[in-house]
Every structure is written in C-alpha cells, then in structure tokens.
Design a protein with these regions (language model features):
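Short helix-initiation/N-cap motifs at beta->coil->alpha
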Residues: 76-85, 105, 171-177, 247-261
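Extracytoplasmic/periplasmic substrate-recognition and gating elements
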Residues: 162, 239-243, 283-353
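Conserved N-terminal structural module of periplasmic/extracytoplasmic solute-binding proteins
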Residues: 2-108, 166, 286, 301, ...
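Hinge/lid segment of periplasmic solute-binding proteins
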Residues: 102-149, 293-295
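Glycine-centered hinge/linker elements that transmit conformational signals in sensory
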Residues: 180, 219-250, 300
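A local structural motif
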Residues: 66-77, 94-95, 163-168, 235-251, ...
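C-terminal capping/gating helix-and-loop segments adjacent to ligand/active sites or protein-protein/ligand interfaces
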Residues: 363, 377-430
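Short helices/loops that flank or line small-molecule/ion binding pockets
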Residues: 83-94, 113, 158-159, 177-182, ...
Length: 438
C-alpha cells in the first residue's frame, strides 16, 4: 500500500447513506466532451499535503492554461485523516466540486451513498490504467490520473561492492531469494553493515504481489493458500538475516525512505511513488548520493519474467471524482477537468515532476526519465513503463474488512507468533465468519 490508512468504512457508509436519504444528487446534463462555455467558473478540488504534493497544483495550473475561464481552487485536507474528513464533508454538503479519490476502497461506499456523479460518459484515452477500479455496478465514478506500480529498487553501488551482478529483469522469486543470500554474504565480506533487503512492515509487501501473480490469487475468494509460497520466500530471507526482521521494523518504526535512502539496504520492493521522493531527498541531502535503478518485481514463474515478457505487479490508482451535489452549471467544467487529467498532456505534466501517471506511452516515459536525478538505464525504463498492474484493493464493499484480517494474518506470520498454515487457516475462517456470501 501507499502510506495511507483505511478509515472506518462501516461508519462512512452509514453517514453517506443518511446524507443520500436527505437529498438527491444532480443529474449529469453534459458529457465529457461538452463545452463549459466561456463564462468564468471556479471549481473547488480536494488535495492533501499541498506543499509537498505538487501534482494537484500542477494539474490545476495546466488545465487553467488550456481553459482560461476555469479556475481550479484547491482545498487542503489532512493527509492522515483525509477519508474521514471527506466522509464528513460529503455528509454535511461541504465537500468540494472535484473529489480526489485517495483510497479505492471508498468508491463503493461513496457510490452507494449517492455522493459521486456518474462519469461514464467521459471518454478515456486508450491504454490508460486503473479505470476499472472506479466502476461500480457498471458505472464509472472517477477517472484515474496516476497509477503507481510496485517495482524493485536497487542500489547499484552496493551490488558492485558485494560483487553481485545487477538485476537483469528476468528474476523469479527463487532468483530474488538467491540474490539476497549472495548480496548479504558479499556485503559482509566487504565490511558493509547494509543488509541485502529491506522489506517494510506493510502486508502489501507480500500479499500484493501474491494477489497479482499467484495462480488462484484474489482476496475476494476467501481462500488464501496461494499466499503460502510468498510467505515462505519472505521468511527465508528474514531467517537468513538478509533483512531486518519484522519485529525490528515495527518496534523501531523503521522507514523505507531511511533504510534505502541511507544505503542501509541494497534492494527494496516499493511503489513507484518513491521515485520522486528519492530524487528529492538526494537533492536535499536527506538521502545519500548513490547510483540506483529499478527492475521489475520478481515473478512467480518464468512465463512473465524477462524483458521480452510483461511482468505482473500490483498497485492502486489515484483518481478524480465529481461531487454528485455540484452546482449543475459547473458539471460540464468539472467533466472537462477530469477529461484533461486523463490526457497525454496531463500525463506529461505529472511525469515532469516525477509522478507516475495513469497513462504511459513513449512520450510520457521520455518526459519522466528526463527529470534530473532519475535513472537513465534501459531496465529502469522498462520496469516503470511495462507491466500488468493488478489492483491492490479490489473495488468491493468487503475489501476493507478483508484487508483488516489479512493484515492480522501478515503480522502473525512475519512476527513468528503463528505458523504460515495456522495463520492462513485463521484468515480463511475470518472470511467465512465476517464476509461469507455477502
């Protein structure tokens, strides 16, 4: 997952459904191609951490340049409590015109509450990722503008110090585990205190790739045996001392930025959002200066490994939705903004500041890797631009509940408090008791 928190979805649903009973949403009167006219219009749009998250202002300014009569005014929310605050504003009628969908899990809740406008009439460019995550009962309720995917970050200098060849894009999980062992031995022999791997404490570091890659994977099915080999690989690396153990990571509140950015680890699986952070921190000195690159995440089998294939990974989109209670006179302008946010021009604007857009093509890739501090090797470009990305969080009303008990399973396995088999069996039982056939 990205550094986000799940809100209490049950509470959100109750608040939104109550709001839906008291008023009805306006009906879309124009499609994404309709003109907003030339009259001055001000749209409000939600965002968070505006001083350190430039994507909102970047898109608002670029859109205004193309549509001088339309101003997009940003409304800042606390990043940690974003969805709780947004739920309250939607229920009270204080939410902005355009709502940034930070967490996919809330889409069904907002849609069921009648809080989002149906934007199915907005035509999206071919090849855009993440659109299906915003579809509920056949209707689209948001448009993706960014799509982060998980890749393998690696420190080229530490690989060289350990005398281990860099990743070549062909690794399976067995190759990854083998490389971790060689790296750990090589780094120790070279007198380095760095570990081969840093695995953050999130459940997604194991489960996200299992869900995307393993045969029979998918959290909505309620049977989690398919995750077993992924936990076996993770525990093997941990037990061999090639990474800080889970209890150390959680007790000491280690950060992935600090561990990789300060060269405490040679490899780390993380989402592409970290690229912009690492470039920025190397520029400010908060991260060390070293040579780094990206490779595809290790694959379940050789069928998807290698640069002649399409590697499988995971990640959720971030998108824009329209408040169902927007002034009808602003609907066309809001849809024009969503149409722009999904366009190639918007993708280039995002790529130029190190953000991974939902639309990736050769021109966008060139723009992204022209950013000062970005890696320039061909494998990094391949890893960033070529992949099949499955959602971390399926768009389903039960997703938040399922992810909660799967997080408990993850903690039990990685901390050693339960065996893999026992923890998976408990998760299967939790699905039956908490979700069942709902």
């Amino acid at each position: 997952m990205r550094p986000r928190r799940l809100a209490a979805v049950g509470l959100a649903a109750a608040a939104l459904l109550l709001a839906a009973c008291s008023s009805s949403g306006s009906t879309a009167s124009s499609g994404g191609s309709a003109s907003a006219g030339n009259q001055p219009i001000t749209l409000t749009m939600s965002g968070w951490s505006l001083s350190t998250t430039p994507e909102f202002k970047t898109l608002a300014d670029a859109f205004h340049k193309e549509h001088p009569n339309i101003t997009v005014q940003l409304k800042e929310y606390d990043a940690t409590n974003y969805d709780t605050l947004m739920t309250a504003d939607l229920a009270s009628g204080a939410a902005p015109d355009i709502i940034t969908m930070k967490v996919v899990q809330h889409v069904p809740t907002y849609a069921a509450g009648g809080q989002l406008l149906d934007v199915s009439d907005i035509k999206l460019p071919s090849g855009i990722s993440g659109a299906k995550s915003y579809v509920v009962n056949g209707k689209s309720y948001a448009v993706p503008y960014r799509q982060d995917s998980w890749v393998l970050f690696y420190n080229k200098d530490l690989f060289a110090k350990a005398h281990v060849p860099d990743p070549d894009g062909s690794w399976t999980w067995d190759d990854y585990v083998s490389a971790a062992g060689k790296l750990q031995a090589g780094l120790k022999a070279a007198g380095s205190s760095a570990t081969a791997v840093y695995q953050h404490g999130w459940q997604s570091t194991v489960q996200g790739l299992a869900n995307a890659q393993a045969p029979g994977g998918g959290i909505l099915k309620g049977k989690y045996e398919y995750m077993k080999p992924y936990y076996q690989w993770a525990l093997q690396i941990q037990n061999e001392g090639a990474e800080p153990n889970f209890n150390t990571v959680t007790a000491n509140q280690l950060t992935y930025q600090g561990e990789f950015g300060k060269q405490q680890a040679a490899m780390m699986l993380m989402g592409t959002w970290y690229v912009a952070t690492l470039i920025s921190q190397q520029g400010t000195g908060d991260a060390d200066t070293f040579n780094w690159g990206m490779a595809p995440a290790p694959q379940y089998s050789t069928a998807t490994a290698g640069t002649s294939n399409t590697p499988v990974t995971f990640g959720d989109p971030t998108g824009f939705a329209i408040n169902a209670h927007i002034d009808p006179s602003k609907e066309a302008a809001a849809k024009e903004f969503l149409t722009y946010a999904a366009s190639e021009d918007a993708a280039k604007q995002l790529a130029a500041i190190g953000i991974t857009p939902a639309l990736i093509d050769p021109a966008v890739t060139d723009t992204y890797f022209a950013v000062k501090g970005a890696p320039t090797d061909s494998l990094s470009k391949f890893a960033w631009s070529t992949h099949k990305t499955s959602p971390e969080n399926p768009t389903d009303a039960n997703t938040a509940t399922i992810q909660t008990f799967l997080n408990t399973m993850h903690t039990a396995i990685m901390s050693g408090s339960k065996s893999i088999d026992a923890a998976i069996s408990q998760a299967d039982s939790d699905f039956t008791s908490q979700v069942g056939n709902s």
